[in-house]
């Protein structure tokens, strides 16, 4: 048994989302969003190196030695998988382990609204799930892939860095590819995927122009492309994609996005006030004719208003989602205020909470 397992299993018993294993510091775990010490002794560099190197294969170790950082997956059989980032720092070496459930949660498990279920019924176009690191994007996407896997008879291909949730074939053929192991980059893997007769392609990160360009083209070709960006809100997401391209191509890209985009789900996780845990606040934008026109005309500053007016088709602004959680007693007004875009709308509930 690898030495790291004892620390990981201890963290899992606390329902931790992450384990921080860093030389020069005590071992810490993030529990319901709060980082807390779980072992008081300070990790030495020698101890940290021994334990972290033990779980690296040859390719991972060479990448780490050459680049001083590496992403990879680690699994304790029948317990959990972990996404790992190992790195060098001022005091030696460290690794952060993100716990991944052994099986993907379903949309029902996540209490997702019906509009998310509806998005999973599309067979072509682009669906984006966005948010900062640790906002639950991978969990949401895995649940959406699970729903498609059960409903479709086709080929689902995922490109990840590293592979997180391992999907078993149900109605679909599942191909999962890891950047750095099965392909040198997201762009290379996505370019290859276009020749592999996919029905659905999941792109773990749309982080560069080449990847974004191929993804947009694939969506136009009739493939359902699902991807993530580290953006906050639907308007910022569309803006990021369009502005990834040179100025002389942006008009054409706006037109392509206006027709191929199916929806954007932007999310963040907040600590719950009714019981220990965290809950997702979701901003949802569906590409209605009104939204499509705004994107095509470059009027992205008006998307927020259009989202607020689109409740009848399941759209919801982030502020609307936060206020709903406050009204249900799931999060405090103060917490919602801190995460809100228009903080003035939350002054009254913030004051009520503080009293």
Where in the sequence are the language-model features?
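Short, flexible helix-loop junctions that flank or precede catalytic/ligand sites
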Residues: 1-355
